[in-house]
Amino acid sequence: MKNNKKGFTLVELLAVIVILAIIALIATPIILNVIDDAKTNAAKNSAYGYIDALEKANAQDMLSSESINVLSGAYTIDESGKLMHDSAEVAVKFKGTKPTSGTLTYADGKLSSGSSITVDGKKFTSDADGKLTLSK
């Protein structure tokens, strides 16, 4: 009589499980880093969007009024996302995650070095060119 046993042995199945576990151990930190980088980039894009919205609001204000008010001084963002300048709230139309804190300092209409903005718990600081970098 012919013996036709088909299937995998217990040792073969255990070997496959061990290999899959090793692959999972290697892949998990990589995937988590990709997710964290995506969250950081999303927060950075929201920060840039908020800054652009402020600058656009100022440009619209200059077009609709007869005076030219170049962005200057410190603009402070409170916990609720309100932007304050000289004790007055500045209206900023913005879609995205609002910042929770920060101080945007402008000189002659240009974002100054050392300005900061926090979005989703990630604090970004500007350099002399207005580029935002994540503060550790």
Predicted regions and their residues:
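N-terminal hydrophobic targeting signals that begin at the initiator methionine
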Residues: 1-2
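Short coil/turn residues that cap or connect secondary-structure elements
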Residues: 5, 39-42, 58
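N-terminal single-pass transmembrane signal-anchor helix
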Residues: 5-31
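Enrichment for repetitive, rod-forming helical segments
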Residues: 12, 46, 51, 62-63
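Aliphatic-rich helix starts adjacent to a transmembrane/signal segment
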Residues: 33-51
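Periplasmic/extracellular, small/polar-rich flexible segments of pilin-like filament-forming proteins
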Residues: 56-136
